[in-house]
Amino acid sequence: MQRHTKPYENVLALIGWTPLIRLNKVTRGIRTPVYGKAEFFNPGGSIKDRIGGPIIDQAEREGRLKPGGTIVEGTSGNTGVGLAIAAALKGYKCIFTMPDKMSQEKVRLLKAFGAEVIITPTAVPADHPDNYVMMARRIAHETPNAVLANQFYNDANPQAHYETTGPEIWEQTEGRVTHFVYAAGTGGTITGVGRYLKEKNPRVQIIAGDPVGSILAEMWRTKGEGKPEGAPYKVEGIGQDKVPGTLDMGIVDDFMTVSDKESFAMARRLTREEGLFVGGSTGLIVHVALHVARRVDDPNALVVAALPDTGERYLSKLYNDEWMRENQLLEADRTTLASLLGVKSRDGGEMPVIVSVAPGASVRQALRLMSLHDVSQLPVMDGANCIGSVSDWSLSAKSLADGKLLDASVGQIMDAPFPIVDVDQSVDSVAKLLSKSNPAVLVRSNGSLEGIVTRSDMLTYMMAR
């Protein structure tokens, strides 16, 4: 735990050295360890806090920003907050342009810092005068004593990550990081971190995620020769309809596209299973990170995904079931067995993922095991295979009828094995399997059995929703 043993001169000193947290529940069945760098621990709640101060410092050094001046920027919200924090300390005004798809939480947050916020249409080409970046350029040009932060073409952006985020990851992993996963918006983070990590170890792989509808992944695949047409998407703060100057495509080893639905589903899982309250872009990044970890399948590898911002900025969107359904991003019940198992494990203390009994164990041992773990049924496992099942009711009834059976082997009197279902199957569909003859189901992830769900687990879930 970080200890703040000395006072700080101001809030800017708290930016950086965010914690690296292992993902445990969403990685169930994956051998490769995956860690998230929790950038929402920055004072402004996002990774963009890292670039606000350096951009302003650069403008001051170059003489472009003078006392009482105005900082102008086109932002999806987070860079605006990073700039607004530094501007508040230095006495500058801020004017921000934002596309209309951004959450109201972000708009209100920027206004809370005293910034003027101008909303622009999302569905316009990158070179259209009403595009949020183009409008910011015009406002900066027309406003006396104003500078454009210009995060999409400002070298201070990737340099900040080269000097801070990259070294932090290297030190926190003791140089063991093998894969870094992020998503390009301006490209500053993935470029700066990627350059630093590859300088330390050229074998480190830099993997980028991209929303379906952004052109960046296709531009990378075609080495800039393609002319893809962008399309609207809901994930905020990442993806582009043109390649930013701060994105070094050559640093990226692979680009993967992810849908809004996949991104938001993963963000909600991270909140409910890992206790990490994150935004939609984090969901996209972790979705890619898990894909990479499965593909690598090496417990000695180490995947680091930066988690850009807090979920507090999306309460009206991805954490609003009504908004999700209106945008066809949420089914009637999106809860999967992975979520249910995560809650069960968190509430269940030290109980193993699957409490089982071997076929050669005695009935007496099976009953003691059920009593010890406060369960009423057990799968009978022969190695990694479920070959049968027993229940306290069945064993008790048979033992009362014939006391000698207490010392008989479980394999002699076991019942049929429990059904096996996949971890991504919906809770509602599995509920139908938990009939009188099926008191439990075993849950499979990536080919191996990872958990058990009983009728009691299902009833607890149904009563809570």
Model region roles, listed by residue range:
Residues 35, 257, 356, 389, ...:
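Short aromatic/basic micro-patch
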Residues 1-344:
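PLP-dependent amino-acid enzyme catalytic core
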Residues 251, 334-354, 407-418:
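Bateman (tandem CBS) regulatory domains
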Residues 376, 388-395, 450-458:
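Short hydrophobic beta-strand motif reused across regulatory alpha/beta modules
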Residues 355-374, 380-382, 399, 419-438, ...:
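The conserved cystathionine-beta-synthase
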Residues 87, 110, 169, 275, ...:
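Terminal peptide-recognition signature
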